[in-house]
Every structure is written in C-alpha cells, then in structure tokens.
Amino acid sequence: TDVGTTITLFLNEDCLEFANEYRAREVLNKYCSFMPTEIYLVNETAEPEYETILPEEKTDKDTVIETIIEDAKTEEKENENGEKEIVEVSPRTEKLKILKRPVPINDPHPLWTKHPNECSDEDYKEFYRNVFHDYKEPLFWIHLNMDYPFNLKGILYFPKINTEYDSIEGTIKLYNNQVFIADNIKEVIPEFLMLLKGVIDCPDLPLNVSRSALQNDGFVKKISEYITKKVADKLIGMCKTEKETYEKYWDDISPFIKFGCLKDEKFCDKMNDYILFKNIDDKYLTLPEILKPVEKDTEKDAADDTADADDGESEENEYK
C-alpha cells in the first residue's frame, strides 16, 4: 500500500518546460539539493531499469522481477596422486533481479548540519568542490554553529585567489531550513564577506518581507554582526597561534581583510593590529610590531634628554 499524499500538478502552456525531466531535475538541484527529506525523481514513462542483489540484501521496498540461479562452476584438476578429478571452483548462487532502486537527488544531511568535531578536512574540501565546482582547494574555512539567541549554521571558505586571472567575487548561498533562497543577499550578509564562498542556513530569517525591511530589521543586523565577529575571531586566532600559516595566506586574504576594514567599522577595530606589512628585509610585521622599536627609541631619547638636563643642572650648581 502506498503511504502519503499524491499531488497532481497541472501546468499552463507557458510552463510546460517543467514537465521535462531534465528541467525539473535542474530546479530541484538548485533549490532542494539539501532538503531534509529525501527526494526521488522518477520518470514513469521511461523504460524500466533493473539490477541484481543477493537475497539477504532485499528490503520491503524492492520489487522482485525474478530469481536467478547460477549453477556451481567446476573444473577438472589433478590431485596429489596425479589423478584427474572434478573440483568445485565457485558454489551455486542465488540472486534476485529487481527494479533498479531509485537514488535520492538530494543530501538530507549536509555538512553544515553536523558538529565540527564530526567533520574531517577531506569532508570540508569535498563539500566545497561539490557545491562551488571549484577544484582548487580552499585555504581554510570557518564552521558556524549557533543556537542562541538565533539559530544559524553554515560554513565559510577562504578561496585561493589568483588575482591575475580570477575574479575576486565569491558566492555566499543563503538557505532556510536547508532550502536554497538566493545567492549574495547583501541585506543579510555583510558586503565584504561576498569575497568568500560559503553557505549560511538560518531558519529564523523572515522570508515574507521586502529587502528594504530586511535592511532595517534588528534581528538581521545581529546575524550580520555575529558572522563578522566569527570571521574576525578566526583570523585573529590564526595570526596569534599560527603566524607562519597566516603569513603564507596573506596574499590571498589581504584583499578581503582590507576591504572589510574599509566597509565595516567593528571588523576594522578588531583587525587593525593584525594587518601585515613587509619591511625592507621582506619580513611580515603587524603595526604594533613596527611601532614597538619606534616607541623604544622614543623612550630612550626621552631618557637621554632627561639625563642631559640633570647633568646641565649639576654643572650650573657647581659654578654658583
């Protein structure tokens, strides 16, 4: 017995393109690739396809067409006594021919729904390749996972940029309950983050409002601030604990950081001390590291001036 509801969709003449299997698959792949319920697209008019399985692999959902018996295979071989005998090479097997099992076209458990501890580096890289069709490995990524005061999950990737040939523009895909909404919605995602690639899923995001309303929504502003803070924290943490890696990535991430400092005051306040500059020895230094020797020289000069002044006063006292 079939379980569930059958919905028959009647299409107007100007919408008949959606009756085409490939067009329907295209739409489903775009908007429902990560929908939490499995989706199967089956063309009922196509010729049926079959596959064979072992009896123990059969499930209640399988439609068995026939049972296939394969007789045991034997060969004539010589035994230890040099006598020829018939030896069984492979035993008699039983297989089931069934209608080919449909494969879901979506992944109901995308990487961003999992805890970061459950994800390996290869998982992140594979997800990046599959979603963005970019086969250059990302430099690093940030896994967003927040439950309070709002529900937000996602992954932001820092792509490797070849500025001579590549566009610096990225892609941030916005989802609501794992259903795709749109790319690069600037009312929700800070403009400078558009240089990155990633996915953000926020079930609490209001969808039935205009873009102007989104822009003035305090809740949306909090989402934007949270994402900005997490990105800054990741970069600062890397600079403090993995300075060599931070320096190695600098040519790729500096356009993003500098643009972010121009566009977002809070991001700028956090990142000011972590922007790198090269000195004449081709060594990377932060602004505080550059100013530190200057401050020491200033303090030394001030101390020397004080000492000279004290010596001058002593000499004056001697001649009085």
Predicted feature residues:
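Conserved GHKL (Bergerat-fold) ATPase module
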Residues: 1-320
